[in-house]
Each structure stands twice: as C-alpha cells, then as structure tokens.
C-alpha cells in the first residue's frame, strides 16, 4: 500500500484519521493559508486543501497526501477564520448567537507519483443558541477554542452552545470529511475495509 500522509498538524484531524485504522504519516504543509472574502467559500477551501496536499510532494514523491481546509461562514455570508484573541472570540460568538452558520471543509487527496488529484468539499450547518455574555465568557474560559474557526469546538464543550446541527457527515464539522475521504482513497485503490491495493 502506498504511504498515506496527512498534511496537517491539527490534533483533531489526526484523531479523525485514526478512526479509519490506516497507517499514516503526519507532516506540516508548506502552504500559507489566506482568507479572501471575494472568493466563494467552496472554491477557497478546495484551493487551499489542494495547496496543502501538493506542498508536500517533494518530501513525499510516492504517496497519497491528504490536505484539508475549513472556513466558517456566518449568517451574513462573511468568512470567519480562527479568532485573533480571546476578545476576538467573544465578538465572534456574540455575533453568531441565535443564528445559523455554515462550515465549508475542503478535501484533497494528491497522488504525488501520478500527479493526480481529487478535490471536493462538504458543508455542515450549525445553529447556535441565544447566548448571554456570561455564557460566552464561561465557555471560552473553560475550552479556550482559539485554534478553531468560529471560536468553538463542537466535539467538546462547544456542543452546549448548539441548538441544531445539520449535515451528512459530522466529521466535516471537525475538519476532515471522512465519508468523502473514504471515497477518495478508494479511487486510489485504498480500501478502508478489505484488501489494500
């Protein structure tokens, strides 16, 4: 089986990859992320996921390299990244409370030997409860989600902020859409269940 490389240092993505039971390497992508409000979010995350995967091609010339990127689009259509500070996180959550928002997660699997790429994206919609200032600050103090787009971790205490979650694959929300990844790996001959090609 070809070497599989996860182009990410995210502990959340690594944990999701472990669910598949496949051996894999982890490497930090050599790619500079940029949020551009003028680019449609689905195009942005696909472009950045592919950029992350391809950035490791020289280091791994015969591998399947997985890149993923996520942005959070608030109810007004504005793309939000990770908060810049605790106060930035307070502002994000204050503005999002009581509204529905969408996560866009891009996925790319790059076969560095064949120079072949599969790229796609998945979405997940979240509706936050109405939140008081005290609830927002209590949450941020207890979880400190400054490394997460949207300022919350739904896989942790952030679930208490939610009123509703909607989507086909909850792992999209965490940053690596596993249903789509299993399909992409299958295209390259990697069977999560069964014989490996």
Swiss-Prot record:
GO BP of this protein: nucleotide metabolic process
The annotated site for Important for substrate specificity falls at 12, 70, 155
- Entry superkingdom: Bacteria
Name the EC number(s): 3.6.1.-
Q: Which reaction does it catalyse?
A: N(7)-methyl-GTP + H2O = N(7)-methyl-GMP + diphosphate + H(+)
- Look at the named UniProt entry and state the broad enzyme category this protein falls under: hydrolase
Q: Which CDD domains match?
A: Maf
Keyword Cytoplasm listed? The answer is yes
Keywords linked to the UniProt accession: Cytoplasm, Hydrolase, Nucleotide metabolism
Read off the HAMAP family from this record. Maf
The protein, known as:
7-methyl-GTP pyrophosphatase
């Amino acid at each position: 089986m070809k070497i599989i490389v996860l182009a990410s240092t995210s502990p959340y993505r690594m944990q999701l990859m472990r669910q598949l039971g496949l051996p894999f390497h982890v490497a930090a992508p050599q790619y500079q992320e940029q949020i551009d409000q003028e680019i449609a979010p689905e195009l942005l995350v696909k472009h950045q996921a592919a950029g992350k995967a391809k950035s490791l091609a020289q280091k791994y010339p015969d591998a399947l390299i997985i890149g993923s990127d996520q942005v959070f689009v608030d109810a007004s259509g504005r793309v939000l990244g990770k908060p810049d500070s605790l106060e930035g996180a307070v502002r994000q959550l204050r503005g999002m409370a009581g509204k529905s928002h969408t996560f866009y997660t891009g996925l790319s699997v790059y076969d560095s030997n064949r120079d072949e790429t599969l790229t796609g994206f998945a979405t997940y919609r979240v509706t936050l409860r109405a939140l008081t200032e005290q609830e927002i600050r209590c949450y941020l103090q207890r979880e400190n989600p400054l490394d997460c787009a949207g300022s919350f971790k739904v896989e942790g205490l952030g679930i208490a902020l939610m009123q509703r979650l909607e989507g086909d694959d909850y792992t999209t929300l965490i940053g690596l859409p596993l249903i789509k990844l299993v399909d992409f790996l299958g295209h390259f001959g990697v069977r999560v269940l069964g014989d490996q090609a």
